[in-house]
Amino acid sequence: MIFRLTFLLFFLYASPVVAGTQEPRVLVIDGIQMEYIDIGAGSKTLVIESGIGMGLAYWQPLLADLSKLNIRTVIYSRAGNGKSQAAKDVSLATSNQRLEKLLSTIHAKENLFLIGHSFGGLHVRAFAAAYPERVKGLLLLDPSHELFDSELNKYDATWAKRDTTKLNGMMNNQPEWDLLQGIYHQKTIADGDIANKIPVVIVTSSKLNESDWWIGHSVQGKKIWRDLHQSLIINNANSIHMVTNQTGHNVPHDNKLLFLSSISALLGLVDGV
């Protein structure tokens, strides 16, 4: 496996065709100014979804590496994040409709490979389900899961509720955080079990004690996290689940090689390498 990923990573970097600019651009989508970056070139397009409240700035340290890949990469800030204008509706469905219009406008409609970090994992699953003919594979980087809160409550309701109250206070009604709480309450998203139907790579952080109080960072919390991630691809014969206790939740920053190798792994699944 290590040899295969190293070979694929070398192939991606070999003779790169660099196109586009690393400077953010702006498109008006449904009356909202949306910032995005479009770099690299190729027949395949990576589309990156960020975590809660995160915009383009989160990915800036990785742009030089991404621009060397033999693949086009599009990163954008959802409404209300980065320098994109705020919107009243930040639901998964509406956010994905805006993304679809952005991608169509810049002629990046086909052969898509979606990367979702944290909360962005919910977005890419829903997008792939809504546009299955366009999406070839998913890379989920320590992704949020709609059942995480309920499973933590099954383990220790008092601890889980105390921590949720603390987190709600820290997030101060951030719209996407509030949306995630609603998803936790519903315990479902409209993804049509897509992660069991197309090539998928999941990277899970099992690093303990990133915080010294949150139940999600406890031994049992991390086990629940791993198990939920595995459940997404339990019936997927063309999938990879990478688990590491050496990398925290911010996988792209904590372990750049793992991030780039996971991209290679996804492309390898699709290409049959």
Regions picked out by a protein language model, each given a short descriptive name:
Residues 32-83:
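Conserved HGGG/HGGXW glycine-rich cap/lid loop of the alpha/beta-hydrolase fold
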Residues 139-177:
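Flexible "cap/lid" loop of the alpha/beta hydrolase fold
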Residues 109-147:
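Conserved hydrolase catalytic core segment
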Residues 20-33:
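N-terminal cap/lid segment of alpha/beta-hydrolase-fold proteins
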Residues 162-245:
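Conserved serine/cysteine hydrolase catalytic core
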Residues 75-115:
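Active-site loop/oxyanion-hole signature of alpha/beta-hydrolase fold enzymes
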Residues 14-16:
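N-terminal signal peptide c-region/cleavage motif recognized by signal peptidases
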Residues 239-273:
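Catalytic active-site module of serine/aspartate enzymes centered on a nucleophile-bearing elbow/loop
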